[in-house]
């Protein structure tokens, strides 16, 4: 399983536009994407966060090349500082555990 945690700072007066775009991705596209197990976006003050969970890397790769991603990610970039997202990827196959 691949988990992506996406985070960005929202530009002034862009909260509403960002929420509208994020809702399109979360409610219209993500539920129908093969291999998408979770896709939730949150706004906390001036911080935008999306948590994505994908069955495997292949499903995530297909998502990243999807037409709706190419269409809406540039619109999301217009709403965030420097047009950049910080993304942390977690591959559950590569997580090391310690018993303490």
Report residues per predicted region.
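Intrinsically disordered, low-complexity acidic/polar segments
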Residues: 15-17, 59, 96
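Short, surface-exposed ligand-recognition loops at beta-strand->loop->(often short) alpha-helix junctions
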Residues: 9-20
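Short flexible/disordered coil segments
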Residues: 1-7, 66-73, 95-100
């Amino acid at each position: 399983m691949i988990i992506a945690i996406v985070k960005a700072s929202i530009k002034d007066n862009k909260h509403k536009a960002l929420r509208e775009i994020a809702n399109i991705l979360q409610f219209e596209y993500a539920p129908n994407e093969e291999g998408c197990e979770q896709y939730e976006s949150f706004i906390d003050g001036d911080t935008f966060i999306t948590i994505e969970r994908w069955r495997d890397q292949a499903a995530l790769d297909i998502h990243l090349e999807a037409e709706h991603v190419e269409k809406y990610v540039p619109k999301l970039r217009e709403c965030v500082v420097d047009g950049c997202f910080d993304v942390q990827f977690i591959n559950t196959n590569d997580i090391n555990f310690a018993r303490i």
